[in-house]
């Protein structure tokens, strides 16, 4: 992955992120990152089929979940589940074997959404939903999260596309904290599942993967559109420790290229769901307007970043902030 923070460029294996997110899908980006080239039509078909045939997890994982409290943080559950994968799939933990490394990669890509959906279902006391191999990657994940056994679940193409873009935009981001953690763990010869578990533990931090959660909590703290000027003034005050979450980026000194796509996606989702009376989303939209026009934000290039829009989009899709 290549990043030019000054020009606002993000490339996966030489391909601009906007092209991959708009014209392709997440599994196409996975293939690109794994093999270095975009797949042919047949290669894409075979890869998709391979991934979707590995979405089931060992049935004992259901019992594994019952060892957690219902209010456990989902990242704590994911760290444990990913580490446990090495106990369930010990035929793909030899990192010196290229074939085992590839099998581990396929298993991680295919099974992590299933485990994440199980973590969500467990937290709200609902029955686990098994994956369906005839659905797309993103549609499968949304169905596992939000369907219930007592009624049908309709696949919404706009929401599915939004989820797929979120996956694509977060697939890789150069040598960030979680990637560095995975590589450091891997340098000791640890198995792929343990390494990814370490990466997820790093991703848990509020300065990394927790940024969109922190952004939504900030919107909750603001509380109403009328209070926005007060918090804008605090953000401009050097002596006030308050920071506007979801604005600016440590790497991108220009507009975050992922944010442009996520902004469009966010508005597509809000329009599709006809969301007009959510106070948090009202605050977010007003903050967006101010940040794109206020001289202070424009001069300092504090544009809304990918976490700002992805947090709002995920909330609109139905995912709770926590």
From Swiss-Prot:
Keywords: Transferase, Tricarboxylic acid cycle. The active site is at residues 249, 307. GO terms for molecular function: citrate (Si)-synthase activity. InterPro entries: Citrate_synth-like_lrg_a-sub, Citrate_synth-like_sm_a-sub, Citrate_synthase, Citrate_synthase_AS, Citrate_synthase_bac-typ, Citrate_synthase_sf, Citrate_synthase_typ-I. One of its GO terms (biological process) is tricarboxylic acid cycle. Gene3D superfamilies: Citrate Synthase, domain 1, Cytochrome P450-Terp, domain 2. This is Citrate synthase.
